[in-house]
Amino acid sequence: MASKSGSGGLREPPNEQAVLNMYEGKRSELSQIYSNITDLEMQVSEHSLVINAIQPLDQSRKCFRMIGGVLVERTIKEVLPAVQRNKDGLEEVVRKLYETLEKKKKDLTEFEAKYKIRITKQEDNKEGGNKKEGNAQGVLVGAASSSQ
């Protein structure tokens, strides 16, 4: 028992299931970060579209902006800098998320190496590949017989 507490019992999972749970948690975090990045990149793209659409227009022209669920009338001169600031802020958040993503990927890779985790999806793909190959054989046989 002394060896368990000496090795940092909180850091070492007690069994295989705990390792699996920790691994799945890390993969889930990565998935959430990817999802957040995708959403924010979409917002950056939308901000760019708005900027490109209103930039060439007369600066005193009316435009409407949604602020906290309320549509507010402003001028392009007032709205354009705010939209640009929002876009810049979103781009900064995306950059930070990419940095976090790289750290989490490295952490996951180290975790996989430490516990010798191998993805078993390759076996699933082989089984799926055999099924597809069986289907493909039927197609190939038909194609082969028509070419003879």
From Swiss-Prot:
Keywords: Chaperone, Coiled coil, Cytoplasm, Nucleus. Residues 87-114 form a coiled coil. It holds the Pfam family Prefoldin_2. It comes from the Eukaryota. GO terms for molecular function: unfolded protein binding. GO terms for cellular component: cytoplasm; nucleus; prefoldin complex. It is found in: Cytoplasm; Nucleus. GO terms for biological process: cellular response to gibberellin stimulus; cortical microtubule organization; mRNA processing; protein folding; response to cold. Residues 122-148 are annotated as: Disordered. Its main location: cytoplasm. Heterohexamer of two PFD-alpha type and four PFD-beta type subunits forming prefoldin co-chaperone complex. Interacts with LSM8, a specific subunit of the LSM2-8 complex, which is a core component of the spliceosome. Belongs to the prefoldin subunit beta family. Binds specifically to cytosolic chaperonin (c-CPN) and transfers target proteins to it. Binds to nascent polypeptide chain and promotes folding in an environment in which there are many competing pathways for nonnative proteins. Together with other chaperonins, contribute to the regulation of gene expression by modulating the spliceosome function on pre-mRNA splicing post-transcriptionally by acting as a co-chaperone of Hsp90 to control levels of LSM8. Required for microtubules (MTs) organization and dynamicity. This is Prefoldin subunit 2.
